[in-house]
Amino acid sequence: PNRVNNLVMIGTAFPMAVSEALLNLAKNNDPGAIDILTFMSFSEDARIGNNKNPGMWMTEGTRRLMQRSSKNVIFKDLLACSNFVSGLDRAKEVNAKTLLILGENDYLTPKHKAKDLIENFKSVMVKEIKGSGHSLMVENPNLVLDYLLEAL
């Protein structure tokens, strides 16, 4: 708790429960898990393009990156999210200045699910990226970088 000066959490919530159906797809390395995560990770605008970088396809780039993951990596990631139960207690122990960067249209970790987490940090600031989904660093990388620099 005392070794860190600044903490930034991007696209977070508590709890981060993951559905059994998605966990089962990921456990069996079913491509459907990647399809669901890709779809749910982006805002509606990002799903149909809207990339600030011409020629880049956000959703397909994300899908391809996940397809390159080693076996069970996605499952273990989702399981860790789902099994993490001490988030509020851990937040109370943080003495560092904390910044949460949340997406307005985040379907995986909706901003209203961060409310209890926010209330348990001692020194917290929240930045919301309008129109962005869970993939904040892909959908709006420059604004995320600006917020990270502010936090330092």
Go through each PLM region and give its residues.
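Active-site-adjacent alpha-helix of alpha/beta-hydrolase-fold enzymes
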Residues: 115-124
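Conserved alpha/beta-hydrolase "acid-adjacent" motif
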Residues: 107-113
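Core-facing hydrophobic residues within beta-strands of well-ordered domains
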Residues: 3-5, 124, 132
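Conserved hydrolase catalytic core segment
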Residues: 1-17
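Catalytic histidine-centered segment of alpha/beta-hydrolase-like enzymes
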Residues: 108, 132-145
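Hydrophobic "lid"/C-terminal helical patch
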Residues: 78, 117, 144, 148, ...
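Conserved alpha/beta-hydrolase catalytic His-Asp/Glu region
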Residues: 15-18, 24-93
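Short beta-strand/loop motif that positions the catalytic acidic residue
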Residues: 94, 100-102, 106
